[in-house]
Amino acid sequence: MLDKVIIANRGEIALRVLRACRELGIKTVAVHSTADANLKHVLLADESVCIGPPLSAKSYLNMPSIIAAAELTDAAAIHPGYGFLSENADFAERVEQSGFVFIGPKAETIRMMGDKVSAIRIMKEAGVPCVPGSGAPLGLDNDENLRIAKEIGYPVIIKASGGGGGRGMRVVHNAAALLHSINVTRSEALAAFGNDQVYMEKFLEKPRHIEFQVLADHHGNVIHLGERDCSMQRRHQKVIEEAPAPGITSEQREMMGERVVEACRKVGYRSAGTLEFLYQDGEFYFIEMNTRIQVEHPVTELITGIDLVKAQLMIAEIGRAHV
């Protein structure tokens, strides 16, 4: 029984989780840094616990402090929101090992989908179309990497396996720049993500960015809630989301929806998630999966009438959501 939930985040998403909990009759505990003691979600929560100083590394990214807050307040579950520890498999694992419910996917699923190379392999096995690419991390053999790029066809894009949020990517237009770009991306990936593995894909020059929202319970039941168009971006960061996506036919929506549902079943997914695609010349190409609630989730809520955060809570509590 989820009688009390730790909200391990701040700002808008913390208020969003608090509202869903309140409407379901679930008590809330806001964890916060010393700088955030007077934020609205802290003042509105049933309880609050200070977990550290303003620096995120010592508060909102401090796993022991968050778990200790759950123990101190006798909470049943932890909702990570988005950002911070929401896609940290180690955190999800530690939460469950400590006897609490992690409101999100299983740790192994987060780990599996967080590695872009692993995620692409799984999607291919599930019949989801992917961008033509290396299909595996690039090795140190320069001749082999040049061969792979030639086979794919320039321009190509070098991506960090552990990257995300529009970071860890470099477009290469010719063979002369390839090897230097691979080395620079490796170094940046190691510094930013602690993982220097990179892979290569065909660079689509004029794609749209389309993402499909999914919900999955503990019993293998998966539904998709249609797509959002997030093509309007600046520096690979989304600026505007629109749903339904203009120009996507009902046949395309149903076809891709079936594929993403099957892919989620294949990996044993649970909770809310989003599969992201590039769309060009009438074709979809998988690029990554977000194993959390997204900033943009209200766009889907407005066109479906489904409260995604409530659904997350119900899935965590009883294993399924009534939507």
Residue spans for each PLM region:
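N-terminal beta-alpha lobe that positions the nucleotide/phosphoryl donor
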Residues: M1-L275, Y279-H297, I303
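A short N-terminal helical cap/helix-turn-helix that marks the beginning
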Residues: I315-A316
